[in-house]
């Protein structure tokens, strides 16, 4: 845990001691990057941090922690910070597919000694993910994460481009609207119009690999925004992923086999900050 970086998901008070009524040392603004110096206090949930030369304690539920710093053996491929995979009905989405949507790319991470992406997830949700990772490894798998925190403006941007494709391409519209059994879904199932749980840092998109980190196949590729990605068509791999994640308290999204979220923290703020 020592040396991991994290970001605040709101204005956060720094305290001298790991309790709420301790002396106030200052306030960290939303989206600021800080360094974690210890694990959180299991009783008060306060965690020791360093920020701009100030050392103190903040409430850990208000932090998005960088996953590679704390679970380095997971495979991380944040395609929205490289070349976005978003498609619908195997059709590229103009100005989205193949684009870097987040404005950052891999950077050298001194804590783990290699280049990697920023992968923020709400601190208590990251603890749950550790449990899922442990189960996956025990069963001969690994986790491969494609997305976690997503700024709200990116959600709205991708949705607008997706809607443009949906409204102009009949083949896309057909596969987004109806599954092969004739059940209606529609575009709202595949991308949020305004707010996503990704904007709160409580959701992640992921899949499984084998023990050698070779990605296993699901019924579709990652981020294929149409009815073939719904969980009613899960293959054995997608069902195994679902079993692992739900065993640790994660909730599913019926339209996306890859998406899991922690609804107990749904009151977390909607964030727009971009990582630097």
Give the label of every model feature segment.
Residues 66-276:
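Cell-envelope/glycan interface and biosynthesis
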Residues 1-2, 50-79:
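Boundary regions of SH3-family modules and the immediately adjacent low-complexity/disordered segments
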Residues 27-63:
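SH3/SH3-like beta-barrel superfamily modules
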Residues 24, 54-56, 214-216:
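Short beta-strand segments
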Residues 1-13, 26-30, 37-40, 69-76, ...:
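SH3-family beta-barrel domains
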Residues 12-16, 150:
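Short, cationic motifs built from Arg/Lys/His that form the positively charged side of catalytic pockets
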Residues 10, 45, 54, 139, ...:
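Envelope-exposed proteins and targeting segments
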Residues 18-23:
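Short alpha-helix capping/helix-loop boundary micro-motifs
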């Amino acid at each position: 845990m020592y040396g991991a970086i994290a970001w605040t998901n709101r204005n956060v008070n720094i305290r001298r001691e790991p309790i709420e009524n301790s002396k106030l040392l200052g306030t960290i603004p939303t989206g600021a990057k800080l360094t974690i110096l210890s694990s959180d206090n299991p009783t008060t949930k306060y965690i020791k941090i360093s920020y701009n030369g100030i050392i103190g304690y903040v409430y850990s539920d208000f932090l998005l922690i960088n996953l590679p710093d704390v679970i380095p053996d997971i495979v991380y491929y944040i395609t929205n910070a490289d070349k976005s995979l978003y498609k619908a009905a195997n059709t590229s989405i103009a100005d989205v597919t193949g684009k870097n949507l987040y404005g950052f790319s891999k950077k050298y991470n001194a804590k783990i000694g290699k280049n990697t992406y920023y992968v923020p997830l709400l601190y208590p949700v990251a603890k749950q993910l550790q449990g899922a990772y442990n189960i996956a490894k025990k069963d001969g798998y690994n986790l491969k994460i494609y997305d976690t925190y997503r700024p709200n403006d990116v959600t709205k941007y991708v949705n607008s481009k997706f809607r443009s494709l949906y409204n102009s391409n009949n083949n896309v519209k057909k596969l987004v609207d109806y599954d092969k059994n004739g059940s209606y879904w529609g575009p709202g199932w595949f991308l949020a119009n305004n707010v996503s749980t990704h904007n709160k840092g409580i959701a992640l998109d992921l899949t499984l690999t084998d023990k050698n980190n070779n990605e296993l196949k699901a019924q579709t590729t990652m981020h294929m925004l149409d009815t073939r990605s719904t969980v009613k068509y899960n293959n054995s791999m997608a069902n195994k992923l679902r079993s692992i994640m739900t065993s640790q308290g994660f909730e599913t999204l019926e339209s996306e086999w890859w998406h899991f979220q922690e609804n107990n923290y749904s009151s977390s703020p909607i964030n727009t900050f971009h990582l630097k």
